[in-house]
Amino acid sequence: STEYIRGINEGRVSSMESVCSEHSPCEHGNIECECIFCWEHDAQCKSRRRELDLGEPTGSERGMANNYEQSRNEDLYCTETVPSSAALQANTITERDIREDFTDQTVDNIYPQLHSGSRASEQLEFAFPTIGTRSWEILIRQSYEHLKPDYKEEDFQSHIRRVRRQLFPEKTMDNNGSQASTTQMLRDDIERCGIESIADSASEDNGDGVDGTCISTVDIQGNCIVNAHGNEQATGSKTRKIRATTTPESSESKKHKGSNNQQNIQEQSSTTAIADGHDIVDGELDGRSESNRETAYYTFVLHKNNCKEDWRYIATTRAKQAPSFITFDHGDHIHILFSSSNTGGNSTRVRTRITKFLSATSAGNAEATITFSKVKFLRNYILYCIRYGIETVNIYGNKIQQQLTEAMDTFKVLFENRDPNDVILDAGCKLYHEEKKEYQQKRCGQRKQQNLTDIILDKIKEKKITTAQQWENIIEPEFKIQLMKEFGLNVDSYVQRIVRIERTRIQQIIKSKTLTEIMVEILNEEYIKNFTPGEDNSKLQNIIQWIEYMFKENNINIIHFLAWNEIIKPKRYKKINGMVLEGITNAGKSLILDNLLAMVKPEEIPRERDNSGFHLDQLPGAGSVLFEEPMITPVNVGTWKLLLEGKTIKTDVKNKDKEPIERTPTWITTATPITNNVHMNETSQILQRIKLYIFKKSIQHREDKYTINAQIQNKLISRPPGLVEPIHMAIVFVKNFKEIYKLIEEEDNAHTVNEKAIRLSEEAKQEAEEWQTALQWNTMEEEQKENEKQTEDQDKESEKETATQ
């Protein structure tokens, strides 16, 4: 499939191979050239010489032959010549012809220099026919028939893509998706790809040239003609975004491109208004590069009188790392710009860090929440800040983010090219909004409700508010007044509804967790606040020891008690749905349950609710319930049996229809037996549905004749060494985790297990075991320190006694 041209050039033999079986060599004198002047489509490349290499005469020089009229039927390597008038009688070859035309086609016969090889006698899998045969004649005349291109559409498209890759490799393509490039870069790329002639003059109709002063988008046509279009046509086009490579060369190319772009922009006429946007490609100044597609810009407004005067000094004394943000000073207020995740999940936390860094007051926090919004178009936002006047611009943060650096670069470019007529220094700032025109008239209604909901919800989550009264007690008056100024008197109705929704959401999450998972969460959040490695943690250990001591004094196995709490919470057994703590006054019943169930958040129902006709109206939808001193009578004993068994019952709700109460884990604290007022038969049925623990000793309170009577005179235990908190009960629970679940497995054999009970996941089990190991090590270290301290004290006392003797 290879043709050879033989020519004589000044007495020297020169030959040249054609890279294609049907076209002439390249006019550039390069036999391997693939430029667009030689090859118009990819189909011709199929005929290109690739694998087969028969060599060339020794001493030959590559070049163009002088004699083009020489017969093409002469072959440099063949001693025979095919007559030009010969005609093929048939296009088919029989089996007999093949045997005759391909005789003795072995490695040894075709390549004598390999006659001594080990495989020289093997038949060739592919060989040329014997010279002069019909097969040889057909091969010479019709060798390219099966390689003719079909000129299909995909061949043209493939060639166009190949030329695109050569002209504009990925490292020089813009990252903003519009395929923008400077014409100077076009010239460099065209010269690199071997295109010798491209018109350097600008056309009169579009005004685009190659003088390096205009940024434009580029389209590559099928005939490989480069057309430059203005930004008016490119803006908003949805072209494919080409990702830039991360090689050092690409980084240098990006820097070079950015410097060229900035230089080109500065060369524009100073009378052109930046706001028109005809000379800036969208995305270049919007900060939409590949590096920050996953991030977004956010902004809010903060008046200076809503910040403390000495906030700069306070910021220098903070131990935490300063957040990264930019401030645009507009006199009495500042506009703050920062970057966060595009989904907005982390933006609220970053905003809170910034307001704390600026020492914002309660009114300032409310203002930041109200004016908080997402910046979709960075260039428009900066033009907005410039239009209403700029006093100073500052960037803060120990580590300046790349997105903020890009924003500052954009600000510098826009500020230097600003139109003085657009700057209104004495104008008051309007609230910055980015929205479609059809939504502008609806803003007052929809956005106001959305902003108020977001503000209240953020505050509820921050302060962990679960009731409307907690909102009144915890939230600062300045914050509530600021909300009333913005949204009026309907704030209270929003608060009540949002609090109810948030409480229901939390209850649904707690319902799906075991007590072990809740205890581990407490450790993850609170343990580091109460335990400091290398320091004196004896107070923490003393409270834990006191809890174990209290159970021991009441003759209650603490592991058994904790195991049954883990059974009741996930509804593990059928027909057992309640736990009762019975004991004398001040025995520590409520102390234990309040700290053990602090994160379970049960609905608390006191005794006075028994006189109400709606005493169970809090239970529909509740995750758990805690009764204090309930009164079980023959009238309501049936309801209590169903409740303690875990059956679904219906209850009356004020101004509503009856609502069902699903199975709800129940805890009860009482000073007298709960079955005192019911029949003996009812008593046994109730006791089958509960787990009962009796506390016999009271915690020492105060030495007073009115509080200490004969009943508890000899049944006192010491007061705790400190305030008992949920973290202490969590440590006691997790420290005995394996023993608790070992006991639960034993109890499973004696009870009917509920198939719908909540199960402990393997991940939570592994985390609890890790915590148990860590707590045991800490306990051992503290005990060792305590023993060493006691030994030292004993030695000192013995030394004193020896000295006195």
From Swiss-Prot:
Motif RCR-2 location, chain numbering: 333-335
BP term (GO), one: viral DNA genome replication
EC number: 3.1.21.-, 3.6.4.12
GO cellular component, one term: host cell nucleus
Pfam families, sorted: Parvo_NS1 (PF01057)
Cofactor annotation remark: The endonuclease active site can probably bind other divalent cations.
Record: active site: 381
Domain named SF3 helicase: residues: 553-708
Cofactors: Mg(2+)
Disulphide bridges: none
Keyword Metal-binding assigned: yes
Residue sites binding ATP per the record: 583-590
Catalytic reaction annotation: ATP + H2O = ADP + phosphate + H(+)
Subcellular location: Host nucleus
Span list, region Disordered: 231-276, 776-805
Binding of a divalent metal cation, residues: 329, 333, 335
Class of the enzyme per the UniProt entry, highest EC level: hydrolase
Subunit structure, interactors included: Homooligomer.
Biological role: Multifunctional protein which displays endonuclease and helicase activities required for initiating and directing viral DNA replication. Also plays a role in viral packaging and transactivation of several promoters. Binds site-specifically to 2-3 approximate tandem copies within the origins of replication (Ori), unwinds this hairpin region and nicks one DNA strand thereby initiating the rolling circle replication (RCR).
Family of this protein: Belongs to the parvoviruses initiator protein NS1 family.
Domain-related comment: In the N-terminus, the endonuclease region is involved in binding to the origin of replication. In the middle, there are the ATPase and helicase activities. The C-terminus probably contains a transactivation domain.
Protein name: Initiator protein NS1
Organism encoding this protein: Aedes albopictus densovirus (isolate Boublik/1994) (AalDNV)
Gene this chain is encoded by: NS1
